[in-house]
Amino acid sequence: MNIRSLERAGRAGKQDGVAVSPGQEEEVQNCVSTHDSNWPVIKDHSVKLHRVSPLLLQCRITHSSRWIAQVLASELSLLAFILLVVMVFSKKWLCFERIRFYQHWTMNVTTKIYTSVHIMSLGLLHIYKSKSYSNSEWESFKLWTNHPAFGVAKITFCLALGLGIILTIWLHLPYIPGLQKLPFFGWIGTVMSFCEGAL
């Protein structure tokens, strides 16, 4: 016999004049009220379990356009940082042996052009290690390395390298659970990526 039938039997007993003890009536009412009050709690709990389902969250995250854009940004930042590191340690970034000129220059101008291209092809760590130059090439080399624009370029490159490290780490931090809830997390990454692109 379920709760509803007990309640109906109690009401029918009252109508038919059947004596029902106060204890039995109170027990039936308490049982009914407890069942009715617990039903929304169970319903809300099942809804919450449905909402917090790990499979559902994983499906929403992996198919979200925002998540895909974040993954692309982090991987592109990692690729750019790898290229910056290669440029630092490379000895020959440009293949200047295959350069051909369509206009004949004097030997002095041609030497300066080749020296300039060679300096641009060197990594940051190998600029001051090259000593296999003739006197004219060494003068052109020193002229390039002592130029103020070259110093500005070095500072800019070092800043871009430092920001590349920070931005690459920052864009990979959202893969750690709980860090996306931090305030202004996305805005800081956006500002750093803009600064790196400006450099």
From Swiss-Prot:
Write down which residues bear the modification named Phosphoserine.
53
Q: Which UniProt keywords apply?
A: Developmental protein, Differentiation, Membrane, Phosphoprotein, Spermatogenesis, Transmembrane, Transmembrane helix
* Topology versus the membrane: Multi-pass membrane protein
Regions of biased composition (Basic and acidic residues) lie at 1-14
The Gene Ontology biological process terms listed for this entry are: cell differentiation; spermatogenesis
Q: Where in the cell is it found?
A: Membrane
Annotated region (Disordered) at 1-25
Major place of localization?
membrane
For this UniProt entry, which segments traverse the membrane? 68-88, 109-128, 159-179
What does UniProt give as GO cellular component? membrane
Domain of life of the organism encoding this protein: Eukaryota
* Primary role: Component of the outer dense fibers (ODF) of spermatozoa which could be involved in sperm tail structure, sperm movement and general organization of cellular cytoskeleton.
What is the protein name stated in its UniProt record? Answer: Outer dense fiber protein 4
